[in-house]
């Protein structure tokens, strides 16, 4: 299924004394995991696995650089290490990625850089492309080439977005049959979160994505993630994302040629070894940064 064609469910707003608004919404597209697209290709092969491991390694490097090497304190790193375990990523590769993130002398590989590219699609959709690379020139050249092939060009677009923290969780295993959405909502309020999205089961990739997405202020990300972990929720993802501002977000209709071209653009970008995440100024696109086949 082309995830762009998934239809959003009804959104309802909840207002509390803290003046935070919590939302429930349908999941428009598959989740944020940049390697899930590779994993789900019908013709998985050694090359696809190599790219998958490479992106996991980049993610670990970035997570360690941003929040440190202790998975007890770094929720993003903890989820990446769990993903690495599931695909049997070599222990030596994991250790080297952690050391590179720390900048430890003797770690294998060149220095890595985190780069964000801002671009505008001809349709008016803005993109923020996040890359982790050990070769700035290679990354810039290849990413610009992909953008040009789809008529997009580098342009300032960050003003179209707001930065937020995102935590994806599954219900505590021992409470799966007894907990209701209201219980998760209460936990989100207690954690100091801003919004929560209840994700329909048919929109979930069980390995990579959570049943609930919680949005936070960037500074509260670790606090909220730790709160949910302390209540035995399974943390599927925890990181910073760019959310399009509602007043400037583009509403791209279903069966629109723009959808098809953006689908192809993002497919091509995610095939690039340096690209980690892509954010779009499409309405509700904080639910849809990866477009699955």
UniProtKB/Swiss-Prot annotation:
GO biological process, alphabetically ordered: positive regulation of mitochondrial translation
Keyword tRNA processing tagged: no
Coiled-coil segments: none
Record carries keyword Mitochondrion: yes
Record key words, sorted: Mitochondrion
Location in or out of the cell: Mitochondrion
Cellular component, GO annotation: mitochondrial matrix; mitochondrion
Pfam families with a match to the protein in the record: TACO1_YebC_N, Transcrip_reg
Gene3D superfamilies: 1.10.10.200, 3.30.70.980
GO molecular function: translation activator activity
Family according to the record: Belongs to the TACO1 family.
Protein's UniProt name: Probable transcriptional regulatory protein C8D2.12c
